[in-house]
Amino acid sequence: MTLFVRRALILTFLVGWVTAPLAADGASAAAAPEARQFDFLVGQWQVSGEVKVSGLVAMIHGRPKLAGSWKAWRTADGQGIEDELTLADASGTPRSTVHFTRSFSREENCWKIMGRDAYKGALPPATARRQGDEMLMTSSGTTPEGKHYRNRTHYLAITPAGFRMVQDRSYDEGKTWDTGAMTLDVRRTGN
């Protein structure tokens, strides 16, 4: 047996040995079509935005401005998205650096989203669904003061060049909403 034939047989054996368990446990199963709904996030982005405030602070200073970057990539298995959003205030002081993991659940027919802020720790888990031309993400949690809230985050005006993110907040189980509590305008800077 020649060296070439011997190597070809070994390679054939190894490929079969590695791929057989993958096929058996379903790891090579195709992603659900919905697993592409957050693909608009993939790339590098420049972020500008503002936070809604009221009362004396708003009268004196106006709405606090935010600036930052957002980068996102598909997970290695192709079933989800990982992304990192970094925001600073107008003076350049870091306010938030959040790493998100987004994966589509076929069983629940929605996106499951986990986030961790470098300054605040773990964020409440969220879910998201495509609704017409937007992605709608919802979550609930408790403020540091112990006040329960709900968030709904709209990803709107989605184009290859950018999108808008608007976050609403409710402190009464969704009966009333503070709309536009935070607004981010996101523009693509790279792939």
Label each PLM-derived region with a short phrase.
Residues A24-N191:
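Hydrophobic small-molecule pocket/channel-lining residues, especially in calycin-type beta-barrels
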Residues R7-A8, Q131:
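Positively charged, low-complexity intrinsically disordered regions
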Residues M1-V5:
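N-terminal secretory signal peptides that target proteins for export/translocation
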